[in-house]
Swiss-Prot record:
It is a peripheral membrane protein. Changing T77M: In HH17; phenotype consistent with Kallmann syndrome. Suppresses the insulin receptor and EGFR-transduced MAPK signaling pathway, but does not inhibit MAPK activation by a constitutively active mutant Ras. Probably impairs the formation of GTP-Ras. Inhibits Ras-independent, but not Ras-dependent, activation of RAF1. Represses integrin-mediated cell spreading via inhibition of TESK1-mediated phosphorylation of cofilin. It comes from Homo sapiens. GO terms for molecular function: protein kinase inhibitor activity. InterPro entries: Sprouty, Sprouty_domain. The modification Phosphoserine is found at S125. GO terms for biological process: animal organ development; cellular response to leukemia inhibitory factor; negative regulation of ERK1 and ERK2 cascade; negative regulation of fibroblast growth factor receptor signaling pathway; negative regulation of Ras protein signal transduction; negative regulation of substrate adhesion-dependent cell spreading. The Cys-rich domain is responsible for the localization of the protein to the membrane ruffles. This is Protein sprouty homolog 4. The keyword Magnesium does not apply. Residues 92-107 have a biased composition (Low complexity).
């Protein structure tokens, strides 16, 4: 309750009132503040704070900020009119409902003021990066020595017996030259010339149309084979047909000549190894002035 006003003081509108002190529970530091004497007409209930609504944790002040110069810079605080200055430690009792509602409104507004971010001091903005940093290309450490040229690395498998390359390109057999004629419809080769010159193409056509579907391919492609089916029937038919077409008797000698020519051409043109069932070793390749030695590794 508010202390009674002494009767000796005149009750006039222009009279002043000394703010009452709180009970003995008030701290000694708060009692040392000087008391402010305000006229009655300047006391406004809209600026009275409610201790049960205000959040004291939101009213924490931020510390001083340091600028580039090193001098601390204090954050500016919002200035208020002297007429609106109120003490947080003053409490009143017996307030009407209108006072509490206006106090709640002012407390909410003050909470919003505290939650607003403090103004940031003007600082020099960092310069925008306009030049990209240079990329340093680090070369990996070559632990295997200098690289071997592709020509030498391709032919590093050598035969242990003859010393020639055993790669697929070098060791594959070479065939006699051939070409396609008549708009890519006829193959001109040594074996084709023998088939047409000895009339063996006629026998192949007969075997193609008269044999079973399972054996027509093998009999037509290899009419003189002894390991195919119907061997006796085929040879009997070719012997009877050779009486009418004696050129069929030249088929076997001509085919033998083609095989010999194939072997001679392959021997001259094949650069790789022609040995069978031999081991291969890794050659010692040299790149530039430095020679890279690899250990022999049989396969």
């Amino acid at each position: 309750m508010e202390p009674p006003i002494p009767q000796s003081a005149p009750l006039t509108p222009n009279s002043v009132m000394v703010q009452p002190l709180l009970d003995s529970r008030m701290s000694h530091s708060r009692l040392q503040h000087p008391l402010t004497i305000l006229p009655i007409d300047q006391v406004k209930t809209s600026h009275v704070e409610n201790d049960y609504i205000d959040n004291p944790s939101l009213a924490l002040t931020t510390g001083p900020k340091r600028t580039r110069g090193g001098a601390p810079e204090l954050a500016p605080t919002p200035a208020r009119c002297d007429q609106d200055v109120t003490h947080h430690w003053i409490s009143f009792s017996g307030r009407p409902s209108s006072v509490s509602s206006s106090s709640s409104t002012s407390s909410d507004q003050r909470l919003l003021d505290h939650m607003a971010p403090p103004p940031v001091a003007d600082q020099a903005s960092p310069r925008a990066v306009r030049i990209q940093p240079k990329v340093v290309h680090c070369q990996p450490l070559d632990l295997k020595g200098p690289a071997v040229p592709p020509e030498l690395d391709k032919h590093f498998l050598l035969c242990e017996a003859c010393g020639k390359c055993k790669c697929k390109e070098c060791a594959s057999p070479r065939t006699l030259p051939s070409c396609w004629v008549c708009n890519q419809e006829c193959l001109c080769s040594a074996q084709t010339l023998v088939n047409y010159g000895t009339c063996m193409c006629l026998v192949q056509g007969i075997f193609y149309h008269c044999t079973n579907e399972d054996d027509e391919g093998s009999c037509a492609d290899h009419p003189c084979s002894c390991s195919r089916s119907n061997c006796c029937a085929r040879w009997s038919f070719m012997g009877a047909l050779s009486v009418v077409l004696p050129c069929l008797l030249c088929y076997l000698p001509a085919t033998g000549c083609v095989k010999l020519a194939q072997r001679g051409y392959d021997r001259l043109r094949r650069p790789g190894c022609r040995c069978k069932h031999t081991n291969s070793v890794i050659c010692k390749a040299a790149s530039g002035d430095a020679k890279t030695s690899r250990p022999d590794k049989p396969f």
